[in-house]
């Protein structure tokens, strides 16, 4: 689901900070 994708994306970026620049 879209919500699950968002959660997984957050977890992924949390462990891979280089994947996406800090948004905040």
From Swiss-Prot:
Membrane topology (UniProt): Multi-pass membrane protein
Reaction(s) this enzyme catalyzes, per UniProt: K(+)(in) = K(+)(out); Na(+)(in) = Na(+)(out)
Keywords, ordered alphabetically: Cell membrane, Ion channel, Ion transport, Ligand-gated ion channel, Membrane, Postsynaptic cell membrane, Receptor, Synapse, Transmembrane, Transport
Highest taxon of source: Eukaryota
One GO cellular component term noted in the UniProt record for this chain: postsynaptic membrane
Alphabetical GO biological process terms: monoatomic ion transmembrane transport
Localisation per UniProt entry: Postsynaptic cell membrane; Cell membrane
Keyword Cell membrane: yes
Keyword match Ribonucleoprotein: no
Function: After binding acetylcholine, the AChR responds by an extensive change in conformation that affects all subunits and leads to opening of an ion-conducting channel across the plasma membrane.
Similarity comment: family membership: Belongs to the ligand-gated ion channel (TC 1.A.9) family. Acetylcholine receptor (TC 1.A.9.1) subfamily. Beta-1/CHRNB1 sub-subfamily.
Subunit structure: Pentamer of two alpha chains, and one each of the beta, delta, and gamma chains.
Protein name as it appears in the record: Acetylcholine receptor subunit beta
High-level lineage: Eukaryota, Metazoa, Chordata, Craniata, Vertebrata
């Amino acid at each position: 689901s879209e919500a699950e994708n968002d959660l997984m994306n957050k977890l992924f970026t949390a462990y891979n900070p280089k994947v996406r620049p800090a948004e905040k």
